[in-house]
Each structure stands twice: as C-alpha cells, then as structure tokens.
Amino acid sequence: MGENEPIHIEYADETELLTEFRQYMADPDTREKAANYLLDSLVDEMILGVVFEVHHAYKTGSGAAIEGQPEDCKPYTIVDLPDMDVFGSSNSKKAIDCSCPNCNRIVAASRFAPHLEKCMGMGRNSSRIASRRIANTRDGGNYFGADEDDEDDADWSGEKRKKKIAPVRTNGSKKNGKTS
C-alpha cells in the first residue's frame, strides 16, 4: 500500500483479491499501515456522524426538545396553613352554582339540568301531560289518547306474575307418581 497506489482497485475474480490480501498481511509493516488506515477511517466516520447529528439538531431546533426543560433549582416548600394542603392548594371543595335563565334561581350545577327541564316544562312527564291535555280538548270522535278507550285494554304495566315453584321430587318417585 504505497502512497501513490490507488485506494480502490477492481479485481477480476475472488482468487486474485485473496492472493493480494495474503501478500499484504504477510508483511508486518503493511499490516500495521492497514490497521492504522482502518482505525483512522472508523474514527473519521464516527466524528463526522456526531458533527452531522449536532448540526441537524441545531438547525431544526430539536436540540431543546431532547434536552428538555431545566429543573427548578429552588427547593420545594411545604405550606403549613389551615385549609391548605402541603403544596399550598385549597383543600375545601366549593359547590358550583348556576343561575336558571328561566326563573333566575340559584341551583347547584349537579341539579341544573333536571331543574331547567321542569322549570321550562320540557320533561318526560310534561310532554305526556300535554299530549293528554290536547287529546281531552279535542272532540270525542277522535280516538287519539281517549280515556274511555283504555278501560277495556289489557293492563301491560301491571304486576309481574309469580312463577309456580315446582315441588321437589325425591329420587324414587316419578312425575306420574309411579316408582321404579
């Protein structure tokens, strides 16, 4: 591996390459030069890779994302005050109140939707009452919601019937009373 020899050489076949490799490795001086060349190439590649990575992080601004936010250097203080937890937050829960836009009453937030539904007359029961009221004001020829028609109908909302409990049989008796 002289100074004026080309670095990249094309070989006709594999045997020619192996022959030349064995010639270089037989000479201790050439072996040392090859090892130094290999080491220099690896170190150059490593340094170049790190330089490109740092340059890319700087140009894209991703270096700050990798580093993260610096930690707060001041020590954490423990708060010892009434109605406060150790971090200084208020530990008493305050109920949130809402004002009804219809009647201007103050209502707890958890009860606001049911209150507004009843206050504005838009609940389930209100619509049923309104349907009944409309049906009652119409003439008697209309069968929509008439009370007298409902008297003969079966009551579907009635009580559930209890199932009869079958008597417990002993091992020797059968259903018709005969024993085996």
UniProtKB/Swiss-Prot annotation:
Q: Name one GO molecular function term.
A: zinc ion binding
Q: Give GO cellular component annotations, separated by semicolons.
A: DUBm complex; SAGA complex
Where along the chain is composition biased (Acidic residues)? 146-156
Superkingdom of this protein's organism? Eukaryota
Job description of the protein:
Component of the transcription regulatory histone acetylation (HAT) complex SAGA, a multiprotein complex that activates transcription by remodeling chromatin and mediating histone acetylation and deubiquitination. Within the SAGA complex, participates in a subcomplex that specifically deubiquitinates histone H2B. The SAGA complex is recruited to specific gene promoters by activators, where it is required for transcription.
Q: Which InterPro entries match?
A: SAGA_su_Sgf11 (IPR013246), SGF11 (IPR051078)
Where are zinc fingers of the kind SGF11-type found along the chain?
A: 98-119
Q: Which family does it belong to?
A: Belongs to the SGF11 family.
Region Disordered, as annotated, extends over: 138-180
Provide the primary localization: nucleus
Pfam families per the UniProt record, alphabetical = Sgf11
Q: How does it assemble?
A: Component of some SAGA transcription coactivator-HAT complexes. Within the SAGA complex, participates in a subcomplex of SAGA called the DUB module (deubiquitination module).
**UniProt-recorded name of the protein:** SAGA-associated factor 11 homolog
Q: Give the Gene3D superfamilies listed for this entry.
A: Classic Zinc Finger (3.30.160.60)
- Notes on the domains: The long N-terminal helix forms part of the 'assembly lobe' of the SAGA deubiquitination module.
Q: Which UniProt keywords apply?
A: Activator, Chromatin regulator, Metal-binding, Nucleus, Transcription, Transcription regulation, Zinc, Zinc-finger
One GO BP on record is: regulation of transcription by RNA polymerase II
Q: Where in the cell is it found?
A: Nucleus
Which PANTHER family does this one have?
Answer: ATAXIN-7-LIKE PROTEIN 3 (PTHR46367:SF1)
